Amino acid sequence: MSFLLNLIPAISHTNHDEMHEPNQTHLHRHADTSPTNQHNTSHKMTTTEPIHVTTGSGESRDHTEPRHVTPTSPNALDGRRITIAYATETGNAQDFATLLGNACTRLRFESHVVQMNDLSPETLAQDVSVLVIVCSTTGQGEIPLNGKKLWKFLLRKKLPPNLLSHVTFTTFGLGDSSYPRFNWAIRKIHKRLSQLGASEVGSRGECDDMSPDSIETMYNEWQARFCESLLKAFPLPEGVEVIPGEKLLPAKFPVKVLTNKPKRDTSDADHVACTRKDVLQGTVVGNERVTAKGHFQDVRFFQIDANTEDNDMADLSRDFSKLNSDSRDLHDVSRAVSAGSSIDFSTGDTVSLFPQNSVADVDLLLRDQGWEDIADYKLDAPSLPPIEGGYVTPLTLRSLITHHLDIMGIPRQSFFTYVFHFATSERQKERLQEFSQPGEGLEDLFDYANRPRRSILEVVTEFDSLKIPLKYVLDVFPLMRPRLFSISQKAHTMPIQLCVAIVKYQTIIKRIREGVLTRWLGGLAIGQKIVFTKHSTPIPDLDNYDVIMVAPGTGVAPMRSLILSRESEKETVLFFGNRFREKDFLFQADLEKAVGDKKLNLFTSFSRDENSGGYVQQEMYRQKELVARVLCSKQGVLYVCGSSGKMPREVRITVVTCIQEVNGWTEEQAEEWVKGMEKSGRYLQETW
């Protein structure tokens, strides 16, 4: 075991947002993962509720092989092949899958790392012999969007019980035990693979965001155990050894510059962004700050018009900017432009926005690495890692860095397992290598990168002898992920309306950090072109239910959409909270209008105002009779949306307390009632 821990490099403190993925309604709003919030987590089994995998029938869909695949490893032995499929929403499961792929390459396997949705049923049924699935759980037991396609196939009733009898498998899950269905997704997948005849190699691994130990430590330990089991099941031939961890593996996605071709101009980043193939196009029609000018938190009411025939980015026919500035009721904008929409949105739907690195940051990296002279030649990349929305064209080094490489994120330890090979200074090489080691190296890395929020670009420029071979660019730098936002407009209207908090803060080393997406978005002008993708993830139909909504901060965005769209005589209650009534009462005009129209019962909490009543959970307790009446007597729905951490846990504790005290129940009885709400889908929770 210790040999395998040393052989296969560990990984660093990972973005904890993976554990806070949204609940079964998929109301995504992960505004910025760069700079990344990273916390300690570990393996902790807390859920005892049995898992029942229910199969379903349906029409067969077309399944195609992924366009971008990991190339065959020259170090693999004939017939020694492993497929590692991941499902993720913030990238953590993908990072683990990539690390596991590298580890298996060192065991002389031909390793293929793919999204679950890119693993076709034909390939799974015929070509896969060893399978590992790495999957996070989205909120209350759901599988992420990029894994649902394969999961739906696996649930078909007509599948024979021996479909996967040729497959040896294991799984690894990422979860958060503060959710009632902790690691539910991976447990469902694991059980279903067994039902279809697959046999286990090694045990399933799980990590828990709520544990004091790091998920990286737990993952490393599980990986070592799995690799040990894998070697026992598939021993190496005599005379063939495992590839040492100190040896640099060949590039999986090699890149070279076509200097024999003309240079390409990709300086117009907005135009280049629109060359992605798998996106929708729109025009910015609103980018209004909705918090007070003197307030430290800049929140934007951001609007995108996609009202064009064939979505061809035609010029606007109205002066949306003037309409927005003249209207205190932001819903007026939606009503004014709803006719003729070519793209339809329902309450709960989300959009992905694609950030761009700044010109200054891109130029700095090009200068530091000596790539300026080759930055504008077209790239030759025989294989590309999969990416949502597709790649821009032409793909030059400049456009690749601008639109696709995450150079401003906090580096993970996997980054250092590559780059120490490329430093020419022995002292710098030794230091970089230390960051790639478990134990003290992990602690040093946390102090160096995570605590001060140091970016990849800063690391590269600080180690001046570090020169990354162009061939390894796609292996060394992580890909930028799109950021997901819930719509806030009334269903079936345009423009798309988003509520976005601009990320900007000072670190402990007195450096200003800005979110890549929100810095870019904050500077977009009216009329500017933008690309996005749409995710149809509507919440359940709540018109037949009384609803209590709890929404601090920008969590109010999907609540606004629900309130504007709701056509029901049922009771609608909102507990909204923020810091200051006069500075960040988001959507105040809309909410107060709904109150005046008898469509909403509104309770507010402003934590920094004197005598404001504190936080949303404190106001809920003051209204405990209402809470108990709606949730118990009227069998209503509770819908919680906002930042992760204390808020969702304290809201749940408050709900249990309200029900207990008003009904005269024991704590155990109230807890069982809330668990029943969670199981029946009447307790909806999204945090990030």
Swiss-Prot record:
The FAD-binding FR-type domain covers: 277-543
Q: Which residues bind NADP(+)?
A: 554, 607-608, 613-617
Q: What is its main location?
A: cytoplasm
Instruction: Please cite one Gene Ontology biological process associated with this protein.
Output: iron-sulfur cluster assembly
Q: So what does this one do?
A: NADPH-dependent reductase which is a central component of the cytosolic iron-sulfur (Fe-S) protein assembly (CIA) machinery. Transfers electrons from NADPH via its FAD and FMN prosthetic groups to the [2Fe-2S] cluster of DRE2, another key component of the CIA machinery. In turn, this reduced cluster provides electrons for assembly of cytosolic iron-sulfur cluster proteins. Positively controls H(2)O(2)-induced cell death.
Q: Where does FMN bind?
A: 88-93, 136-139, 174-183, 209
| Residues noted as binding FAD in the record, renumbered to the chain | 453, 483-486, 515-518, 688
Protein family (similarity comment): Belongs to the NADPH-dependent diflavin oxidoreductase NDOR1 family. In the N-terminal section; belongs to the flavodoxin family.
Q: Which named protein is this? A: NADPH-dependent diflavin oxidoreductase 1
A molecular function annotated in GO for this UniProt entry is:
oxidoreductase activity
Task: Give TM segment ranges.
Answer: none
Q: How does it assemble?
A: Interacts with DRE2; as part of the cytosolic iron-sulfur (Fe-S) protein assembly (CIA) machinery.
Extract the PANTHER family matched here: NADPH-DEPENDENT DIFLAVIN OXIDOREDUCTASE 1, NITRIC OXIDE SYNTHASE-RELATED
Instruction: Name the species this protein comes from.
Output: Yarrowia lipolytica (strain CLIB 122 / E 150) (Yeast)
